[in-house]
Amino acid sequence: MYNCPNCAGNLVFDIESQKLKCEYCSTLLDPYEYQKSQDAEESDMFGVTVYTCPQCGGEIMTTNVTAAGFCTYCGASTILDSRMRDEKRPAHIIPFTRTKEDCRKSYSSLVRRALFAPREFRDPEFLDRFRGIYIPYWVYNYDFSGDLHLKGSKTYRRGDYKITDHYSLSGEVDARYHGLTYDASSSFDDTVAAAIAPFEAAKMQPFTPSILCGFYADAPDVGNEVYREPVLNSISQDSIERLSGVPEYRSSGADMPSADEFKNQLRGSSMNLSSEEPVCAYLPVWFLTYRKDDRVAYAVMNGSTGKITADLPVDKKKYILGSILLAVPIFAVLAFLITMTGQMVLTASSVLALVSLVIYGLELSAISDKDSHADDKGFAAAGRSAGSSGSPDAGDKKAEKGVFAAIRNYGKYALLFLVVLLVFPRLGLDYLTGSGNLTGFKIYGAVSVILLFGALVFIWALADSETAKKNMVLQIAGSVIAVGASAAILVWNPVSDLWFYGGSILAAAGVCLSFLGIISKYNILATRPLPTFYDRKGGNDRAK
């Protein structure tokens, strides 16, 4: 507890004044001078209260704040368990300079542009749940100098010949990259950290625990070796971009070499590359959590620069209403400008259904990557698990899945063979008899079946997580029926247009059903699985 020396009231760090402020008598104190008066001796540890969520295991630390009744990471409304602990003192800290009111304004502006965002995202009570957390980051400093030798090239045409000129780009370089930051917490997704980067290294100050007053902090559990390669990649990319602006290089017109080639130069004998041992720093982040069922959405703002990112799912009711309001004028305009036959309408519906299947498949791939934390090095390095089964019969279920997967794969090819036997003989008969009924619409109808098969194989190949597979068959059924029915009618080519218009209505209904499935999958993609921190390892042992 940090108490006011005048009235013994609770002290908090005031963002506007950048000083400690008493909540009762409004006394302002310099955080460094106050800390000196409190510390009997310098120590590389400082005492904190650790609050743990009983549902997900997430931890946040504080020096003097009673935890609110909800978890920052999983959004659960619960009483957090607490205990005292000594934490390793970081080297630096950037105090908050953006207030909670700044968060509300920035987030409200972001949500205002998201027309289909859930109504709760505009609720003032919800916006008041922004929580200030200091996230641990590793700070990297690199210096390099020496002779630079790179290869460039310029390709152009002269008549029928394609000519490539090769250039040797040489020079001397002397550069320093200081204050490069990467998060040291496995609970803070690397993609989110990248979205709010960079922090202003010039604002870093020596750490003192009193600056944490009124805020929370996360514990480091990712070692500094994890991001050494990404740091060099970042330095190489920035260096190449800067070199491309040098007049001597730019005047040649040559294409600059890749960042990988520059990185190889950094590690070569002609370059003196040096780095300091990375140090830990606490950097300010505003955090807002929205939870629905078994998914969470985060809004995160850089507490120093104000840069914000947010997960924004879609409200299905708003989406349906907006789609109807948009579709009516579009349909009216098209009806006046374009005369479409029944075959054209049916073909267009079929194409739209195929496109929806491709979009659906791409979403499945993105969901699998996101839920497995494929782009989060810190998550993997901390020994975290994206999800596992602890049941004793998990191995048997896996083997059972393998058997059914094999049957399903062979079944696809059998189905394709059956379709070829049924559809293409009809087209061949039209061609051999010269009946004149072999039209482009008929050919498309047959080809669309092959495309449908390819789309289904594409979808099944990308659905490699349970979240992605959930309700998948139902969600794609509409488009599958749309393509199948359209193909059958186009190949049959009945005399009456009623078949084409009836098929178009059926196909349109199927596409609408599938688009609802796409929105459902988008909402999964726009949110995150509930975190589990019970397998979280580390603390000061890993983050050393």
Predicted segments with their positions:
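Short Cys/His-rich "knuckle" micro-motifs
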Residues: 14-17, 32-35, 63-66, 81-84
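Extended, hydrophilic extramembrane loops/domains of integral membrane proteins
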Residues: 283-317
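Charged, low-complexity helical/coil segments in non-catalytic cytosolic or luminal regions
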Residues: 88-291, 317, 329, 338-414, ...
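Short Cys/His-rich micro-motifs in 6-15 aa windows
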Residues: 26-33, 74-82
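Alpha-helical membrane-embedded segments
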Residues: 353-356, 445-456, 481-486, 497-523
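Canonical alpha-helical transmembrane segments of integral membrane proteins
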Residues: 323-338, 412-427, 449-455, 477-488, ...
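Short cysteine-rich clusters marking metal-coordination/redox-active sites
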Residues: 4-7, 22-25, 53-56, 71-74
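Residues immediately within or flanking Cys/His clusters that coordinate Zn2+
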Residues: 1, 17-19, 46-50, 68
